Amino acid sequence: MQQNKTVSQQKTINPVYWVPTAYFAMGLPFIAINLVSVFMFKDLGISDTQIAFWTSLIMMPWTLKFLWSPFLEMYRTKKFFVLVTELLSGILFGIVAFSLFFDYFFAISISTMAVIAFSGATHDIACDGVYMAELNKEEQAKYIGVQGAFYNVAKLVANGGLVAMAGALAEYFGAIEGASLEANKGAYSYAWMIIFAVIAAIMVLIGLYHIRMLPSNQIPSTTKKTTSEVGRELVAVIANFFTKKHIFYYICFIILYRLAEGFIMKIAPLFLRASREVGGLGLSLKEI
């Protein structure tokens, strides 16, 4: 009786209470790693080559997440993975924040961000799964705009508000625009530590909020599949995908359609921050 009551209560949770926060939590780690970290590493003296290479490489989990998506069905519920990945990402962002004063901060932070990327990609899979499982087709159509809007709100908050806040904090701690790296590094380290601590706190708070507010009427599957069985099914699906007519034309279109945007997304922040002496625009974080 108590179980039936709990399920009934979960069914009454209005999507407006969890769809915005779930998709905000989906967008925040992606933007923090893909764009915000570029500004941080630039301010802390990492070379453009290393920034472009490593921050691009650690984004691969979002491209390859389909490879482990089927395996999530073998363990627990989708809500479980949403909660774990949100809380884990929050903790790891905290590690990034407090690693900035170590001598090997770049190695520590970039490796930690690689784990966050895997966690964030897994969160995407599980979050979309909750959305599809908990809402009927009419509700999915109704809230499709909400999920897209709050994913983009995360972009504005992270790449807009938090970057500007980093600039204001750096000035507060004594950074002088155009001064040497040695003169400004301490101020920028404190500023970016606070920014990534804020991101960490947001992710943890959303995770705690979702413990109660994220619905989960899913019952873990009683039919246990082995890893090899799931692997064979995945290979079969991929093989079938490539048998579709004109599939290689479609793949080429998908890759080329946003190829230029993909290149400029990573390099543009470096160009905006680079001094005019080396061909950049020399903009401050607040101006960007």
Label every model-predicted segment.
Residues 82-105:
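C-terminal ends and interior cores of transmembrane alpha-helices
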Residues 2-13, 215-251, 278:
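Juxtamembrane intracellular "pre-TM" segments in multi-pass secondary transporters
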Residues 200-220:
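C-terminal membrane-cytosol helix-exit motif in multi-pass small-molecule transporters
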